[in-house]
Amino acid sequence: MSDATSMKHPSGLTSGDFTAAEEPFALFAEWFAEAVASEPNDPNAMALATVDADGLPDVRMVLMKDYDATGFVFYSHLASQKGQELAANPKAALLFHWKSLRRQVRVRGLVAPVTDAEADAYFATRPKQAQIGAWASKQSQPLESRFAFEQAIAKVAAKHLLGEVPRPPGWSGWRVTPSHIEFWHDRPFRLHDRIEFRRDDPAHPWSKTRLYP
């Protein structure tokens, strides 16, 4: 739906009480589909939080490129700040915030690399200029100037003028397998609705708790 207000009842609830959901991924799929229809740009944008070697939190926006019952997938450079932090401490938190719908979803869990086959398949779908950029960028490293970056891009582009661009060996993806997923929906006077799903093991069923706002 394109108008979040059209989804509200006088009670402030969205059409259908989402707190009755018994499984988080089906609920996420519903909310994400509505975000795709409602958000003006990047409904798949999510904040990714990691920690460095000193335990100092780090957060940045990334794009979710896939999700299913096993978790949420994103891609980047393995040697980037986030890549190094995840290699040292493979745990992360995600936050989806859909302002047009007045909703957010929080995710916490363990992180593991995707397979080479998954990374290759996704990389092949990227525009060629983005593929070239992945080769030219030394993400998170100091850059002398924009011109130096443009020179690197031109050099890679000349090398791959014809044919397909292979995936760089230092570029891949990660999957966040959730142990916690929380759904939050705004209601008047800050009397919001929150439910949290938890499980310690992907083989176990989810437990659900309603939380005070």
Swiss-Prot record:
Residues involved in substrate binding: 65, 122, 126, 190-192
UniProt remark on cofactor binding: Binds 1 FMN per subunit.
Residue intervals passing through the bilayer: none
Pathway note: Cofactor metabolism; pyridoxal 5'-phosphate salvage; pyridoxal 5'-phosphate from pyridoxamine 5'-phosphate: step 1/1; Cofactor metabolism; pyridoxal 5'-phosphate salvage; pyridoxal 5'-phosphate from pyridoxine 5'-phosphate: step 1/1
Substrates-to-products reaction catalysed: pyridoxamine 5'-phosphate + O2 + H2O = pyridoxal 5'-phosphate + H2O2 + NH4(+); pyridoxine 5'-phosphate + O2 = pyridoxal 5'-phosphate + H2O2
Cofactor: FMN
Residues that coordinate or bind FMN: 60-65, 75-76, 82, 104, 139-140, 184, 194
Keyword Ligase part of the UniProt annotation: no
GO biological process entries: pyridoxine biosynthetic process
Molecular function GO terms recorded: FMN binding; pyridoxamine phosphate oxidase activity
Enzyme Commission number: 1.4.3.5
Keywords recorded for this protein, A-Z: Flavoprotein, FMN, Oxidoreductase, Pyridoxine biosynthesis
Coiled-coil annotated spans: none
This protein's record includes keyword Oxidoreductase: yes
Family note: Belongs to the pyridoxamine 5'-phosphate oxidase family.
Protein function: Catalyzes the oxidation of either pyridoxine 5'-phosphate (PNP) or pyridoxamine 5'-phosphate (PMP) into pyridoxal 5'-phosphate (PLP).
Subunit structure: Homodimer.
Name this protein carries in UniProt: Pyridoxine/pyridoxamine 5'-phosphate oxidase
Protein species of origin: Rhodopseudomonas palustris (strain BisA53)
Higher taxonomy: Bacteria, Pseudomonadati, Pseudomonadota, Alphaproteobacteria, Hyphomicrobiales
